[in-house]
């Protein structure tokens, strides 16, 4: 086990550049086009002239739906699946974050069309809990997963252990994950000291923690070190520091604050900018992480859970003759 990100397998085996990540996903894209050239046929109810009828529509394989790298509906849905299962079992956030990383890494190499996504989520949570030293009884885990997704999770717990071997193979047994949460704690302590003297409220820290949680939906954990993500989330938090959201979500408030040039003139923002300059953090990576968050929240506003659930139900439960 590596106690430092800089000597870890996360950095040396699972950190990509944007170009190398795009190359890996292009390989999967081409494989999907070969394996599933027919796309996905879905049956939709339509009403014309007062008469209800069913129509069949084809979603081409080249469409973004059900491609993890392109479909934010799918990304956000996966995030909620892990969180729902985690809440039922009272699993701590570190383990759920590790499960998110396992899922993201796995879906670089495998398509949701060739595996059971719900089994993948269950197995990622099961393995992450073991690695993060908060193991769950497999029967309890499977029981809770079946309560949430009875159509997709078989009652036999050995199916999860079988999937675990598949998951371990794709992860190449590199399981230790370093998260931004620890970096956040360290940076907050530094900010309290001179010359910065920035003390964040409990609400600010909670907002920052939530931003880090949301960041697991996008690719930043595959691209940048944990401290970059922590700094980016702190930057967003400080940008909306003390500003009422008027009932809007943290997501919308963050997006609006980053686009508002007046934020750069606040004393807290000036002090934090000084911290970033003196710490020699890679500003390009920080700004790209912030942009990734804004892009995520723009897509989140358009999130359509019923649509992605419908597609997955059609994909996994359709009769063999319809494939």
From Swiss-Prot:
Q: Is Cell cycle among this UniProt entry's keywords?
A: no
Which cysteines does the record link by disulfide bonds?
none
- Membership in a protein family: Belongs to the cyclin family. Cyclin C subfamily.
- Domain Cyclin N-terminal as annotated: residue spans: 45-176
Extract the InterPro entries matched here.
Answer: Cyclin-like_dom, Cyclin-like_sf, Cyclin/Ssn8, Cyclin_N
An example Gene Ontology biological process: cellular response to heat
User: What are the recorded GO MF terms, alphabetically?
Assistant: cyclin-dependent protein serine/threonine kinase regulator activity; RNA polymerase II core promoter sequence-specific DNA binding
Q: What is this protein called?
A: RNA polymerase II holoenzyme cyclin-like subunit
A GO CC term assigned to this protein in UniProt: CKM complex
* Chain's role: Component of the SRB8-11 complex. The SRB8-11 complex is a regulatory module of the Mediator complex which is itself involved in regulation of basal and activated RNA polymerase II-dependent transcription. The SRB8-11 complex may be involved in the transcriptional repression of a subset of genes regulated by Mediator. It may inhibit the association of the Mediator complex with RNA polymerase II to form the holoenzyme complex. The SRB8-11 complex phosphorylates the C-terminal domain (CTD) of the largest subunit of RNA polymerase II RPB1 at serines 2 and 5.
Q: Please give the Gene3D superfamilies that the UniProt record associates with this protein.
A: Cyclin-like (1.10.472.10)
Q: How does it assemble?
A: Component of the SRB8-11 complex which consists of SRB8, SSN2/SRB9, SSN3/SRB10 and SSN8/SRB11. The SRB8-11 complex associates with the Mediator complex. The SSN3/SRB10 and SSN8/SRB11 kinase-cyclin pair also associate with the RNA polymerase II holoenzyme. Interacts with ASK10.
Q: What is its main location?
A: nucleus
* Annotated compartments: Nucleus
Looking at the Swiss-Prot or TrEMBL record, what is one Pfam family this protein matches? Cyclin_N
Query: Keywords on this record?
Result: Activator, Cyclin, Nucleus, Repressor, Transcription, Transcription regulation
């Amino acid at each position: 086990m590596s106690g430092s990100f800089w000597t870890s397998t996360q950095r040396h085996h699972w950190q990509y550049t944007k170009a190398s990540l795009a190359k890996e996903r292009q390989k999967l894209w081409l494989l999907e086009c070969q394996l599933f050239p027919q796309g996905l046929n879905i049956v939709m109810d339509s009403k014309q002239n007062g008469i209800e009828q069913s129509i069949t529509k084809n979603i081409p394989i080249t469409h973004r739906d059900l491609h993890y790298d392109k479909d934010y509906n799918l990304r956000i849905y996966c995030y909620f699946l892990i969180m729902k299962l985690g809440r039922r079992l009272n699993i701590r956030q570190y383990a759920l974050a590790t499960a998110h990383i396992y899922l993201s890494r796995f879906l670089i190499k495998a398509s949701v069309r060739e595996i059971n996504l719900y089994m993948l989520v269950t197995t990622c949570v099961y393995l992450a809990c073991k690695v993060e030293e908060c193991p769950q009884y497999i029967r309890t885990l499977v029981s809770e997963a079946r309560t949430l997704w009875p159509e997709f999770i078989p009652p036999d717990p050995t199916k999860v252990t079988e999937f675990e071997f598949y998951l371990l193979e794709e992860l190449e047994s590199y399981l230790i994950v370093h998260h931004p949460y620890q970096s956040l704690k360290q940076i907050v302590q530094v900010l309290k000291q001179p010359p910065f003297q920035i003390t964040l409220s409990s609400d600010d820290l909670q907002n920052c923690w939530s931003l880090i949680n949301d960041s697991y939906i996008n690719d930043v954990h595959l691209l940048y070190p944990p401290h970059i993500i922590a700094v980016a989330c702190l930057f967003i938090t400080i940008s909306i520091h003390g500003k009422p959201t008027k009932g809007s979500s943290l997501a919308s408030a963050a997006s609006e604050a980053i686009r508002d040039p007046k934020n750069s003139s606040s004393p807290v923002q000036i002090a934090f900018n000084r911290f970033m300059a003196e710490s020699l953090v890679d500003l390009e990576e920080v700004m790209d992480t912030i942009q990734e968050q804004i892009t995520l929240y723009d897509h989140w506003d358009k999130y359509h859970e019923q649509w992605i659930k419908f597609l997955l139900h059609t994909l996994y439960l359709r009769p063999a003759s319809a494939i």
